[in-house]
Amino acid sequence: MDSVKNAAKAATGQDSQFTSGHQVPIQDMSQPSQQSDMKGPDPVNTEVPTEDGGYQTYRAAGKLKGKKAIITGGDSGIGRAIAILYAMEGADSMIAYLPDEQKDAEETKEEVEKHGGKCYLFPTDLTKRENCAELVKKAVSEMGTINILVNNAAYQNMISSISELSEEQWLKAFDTNIHPYFYLSKYALEHMKSGDTVCNCASVNAYIGRPDLLDYTSTKGAIVSFTRGLHNQQIAHGIRVNAVCPGPVWTPLIPSTMTKEAQDQLSATPMGRPAQPSEIATCFVFLASQDSSMISGQSLHPNGGVVVNG
């Protein structure tokens, strides 16, 4: 791991939070996880790296002006950063989250409004089909339409062997990580039109086959395939469907679901560090905007430099 960090530092000439200097503070958290309970450093939502190894506030350009988005898991982590950057680009959002995560959701709403956007809160359990339908109905009622669907919410729990992986956890992973993607896409697409987009959050694990996250990895592979199939259905209607496949990201999901040993390995990417949520959220801005007008059915790989050939 030291050689990876040294290589990253040598390549950049810097040692900052965004290069090789961002060390994960090992900690324990329970589920559902609260971003407000994380030990420092706080996840970064609105700043992006600069060439000199520092970072600056994200520079918006009105790329999503007037757009309306649904973002699942929008209370914290990647979802929170997406909601904030969407607001900076001119979009309003309705964020869905578990009822136990209300404090984080309120903080996201405050940040979104600080950057000029509207943020509608919808606490719910998306493993239930009827709640997915109600989320879409409420979004249309409050915002008037849906232009962007961000399927982002996820569950994971490390288990080292298939013999120890319970049937209940396997089902929970699929009920959380892929079934709502189907339900929400099915219901939201009834209200979407040409130029609108669906952005799904997959994972590098779908490509590397992480053994201690077998169920999670399987659902993320399903999301990649779902993205490709839905794209082939919807592209004739002018609706683009893409996925983002992050590597390790400093979010509440990490300390609440990973062992201390696993957390210690999060910097073992070619870049020598995990990502910040802001670095993943920029991909969701790109895919939701006209900057990516020629991209559909594809996956972006902000994974710290892991070559996946997929």
Model-flagged regions — what are they?
Residues S203:
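Residue(s) in the substrate-gating loop at a strand-loop-helix junction
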